[in-house]
Amino acid sequence: MKEGIHPKYNEITVKCLCGNSFESRSTKAEISTEVCSQCHPFYTGKQKLMDTAGRVERFRKRYNIAAAPTEES
């Protein structure tokens, strides 16, 4: 490698919003992340439910669309 053209590569602590932290290497001084392997649903097996029903209702209200009739058996 050429001398003097590469950024300094430091050992840093990466901090997650869940409180977890781990060591890594980067050219940045510090890194903070919103999701890590300790809190991501894929790794934890816990699913976070999103409020999609509220979004659908807002869409229908905005465009004045009546709800589809439900099929009863």
From Swiss-Prot:
SUPFAM superfamilies: L28p-like
Name of one Pfam family that matches: Ribosomal_L31
UniProt cross-references to Gene3D superfamilies, sorted A to Z: Ribosomal protein L31 (4.10.830.30)
GO biological process: translation
GO cellular component, one term: ribonucleoprotein complex
UniProt cross-references to PANTHER family, sorted A to Z: 50S RIBOSOMAL PROTEIN L31, CHLOROPLASTIC, LARGE RIBOSOMAL SUBUNIT PROTEIN BL31A
Protein name as annotated: Large ribosomal subunit protein bL31
Record organism: Citrifermentans bemidjiense (strain ATCC BAA-1014 / DSM 16622 / JCM 12645 / Bem) (Geobacter bemidjiensis)
Lineage: Bacteria, Pseudomonadati, Thermodesulfobacteriota, Desulfuromonadia, Geobacterales
